[in-house]
Every structure is written in C-alpha cells, then in structure tokens.
Amino acid sequence: MYLIEQELRNQFAAATQTVDALFAHKDALAQALADVKSICVLGCGSSYSLAKSAATLLSQQAGIPATPIAAGDLLVNFPAYKRTLEHSAILLLSRSGATSEVVRAAALCKQQFGSRILSICTQAGAPVEAHTDLDLILPWAYDKAVCQTRTVSNLYIALLGLAYIAGGNDAGLQALKGLEAYSEPFCSQQEAALKELAQQPWTRAVVLADSGPAGLAEEGALAFKEICRRDSNHYHMLDVRHGPMVQINQDVLVIALVSSGDRALQAGLLADIAKKTSRLLVLD
C-alpha cells in the first residue's frame, strides 16, 4: 500500500483526535475569537484553498467578516492589504508551520499591526509559533506524502469546529464526534463503485461545490492533478453554466457535492450535466 493510501485511510481515526483537541481547547479558542471584528485567513497551496472554506464558515457560523488571502500574495503586495489587515485578527493554516510565505507573512502582520495571530498546523515547535498567540496543533494529521489528504480533511474539520465554537453552535460541534463511526463504514461501502468509476477512460475531472465546502472541493480538484495527473477544476455549482459547461463531455468525470439549499436548482443543473456525460458522481 502506498504511503498516500495509508494516510488517506487513516484520516477518520485522525479526525477523532482532532475533534478531541477542539473540545480540549474550546474555551481558549472561544476567548481568542470573542471580540474579533474581522479576520484574515492565510495559507499556501492546499491551505489557501482551505482558507477560502474557513472564511465562508466563519462568516456563516459566527458572523465574522473573513477574507482569505494567499500568503505569497500578501508578501508581494503587503502595502495594498494595509486596510484589510490593520484591524483584523489573523488565522494561519499550514501542514508544516514552516512554509516561508506563511512564516514571513505572520512576522510582518505582528510587526506592522501587532495582529492577534492564531495558527492551525500539524507540527509542534514549528517556526510560525514564534509569531502566534494561540496554536492548535494536530500532529496525528501530519502527512509525509507530498500530496496532502489526511492533513487537508483534518484541517477542514478543525476549521468547521472553530467556526462552530465562534458561533456558539454546540450541537454542530457535538455532531463532529460521530465522524469516525459514520465515515469509515460509509466509505468502505462505496469503495467498489469508486474503483470501477476510476478505471473508466475519462481524462479530466470537474468538482462542483458551494458554500463552506467549496474550498475543500477546490483542493479535491487539485488532488487529481497531483495524484493521478489528470487535468481538473473546481467550480461553484450553478457557476459551471457560465463557460465551463461547454467543455463537459463524455471524457469528463464530474463530481458534485449537493448542498441542503435549493434542491430544484441543483437538480436541474445535474440533469443538464447528465446529458453531456454519464460519468457523474453525486455526493448528497
């Protein structure tokens, strides 16, 4: 079994530890965000995709205006972000906590604005800790493989839990405790069908998702490039109609994460996609 598959299969056991960590640090996390008026979420690569999810989740669950920024963008264009940063807390996302853009961006924010900085990463004692006020460390979620899987899913779980804590959604936080018990049997039941779909002769993947999971889905699309070297893109559900739809055909695998929102609008889109490709995986 490849290392990446080992880490992928371990993600739900790791999720239980991540949820335990959220409960253990619940009071500290709530206090850190209690008087925050706005927040900037920084990351690179996969973590930047997750920063987009984090910004949406914090806005939806806690009513905190949140802006996702690629850490490299911030470094290059730091003066342009002055008004965005000067009264905002900073949330850093990183697998290693050592990514140079993230560490340097944290240092600049602390030096220039005295920013309150929170970090979620999967390595203890990382360089970024020299600039942070609070760290949530998830060492059990650290991926050694180049392509992140377990790290991504656990960072997302931590972000969802953080948003629940900030918004006082105790029921949502409590529900996360059932992730491992639910997810492992569910995934094992789908494995044969997924293997069959993977072996079909598609050449490109399109991942559709809205709202909080959209950033996670963007990272999912990136995984096709990194792991199986297939061209891939993420789009918001209805937004795929505005241009990208013309490239969907029988050579394209479409994965759609359906939300609990307007079901008729989503069903109409999926019906149109099904006319273009039979390779349609709907996650509902």
Question: Where do the PLM segments sit?
Answer:
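Active-site phosphate/pyrophosphate-binding segments
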Residues: 2-36, 134-138, 142-255, 263
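Glycine-rich phosphate-binding loops that contact phosphosugars or nucleotide phosphates
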Residues: 34-181, 210, 245, 253-284
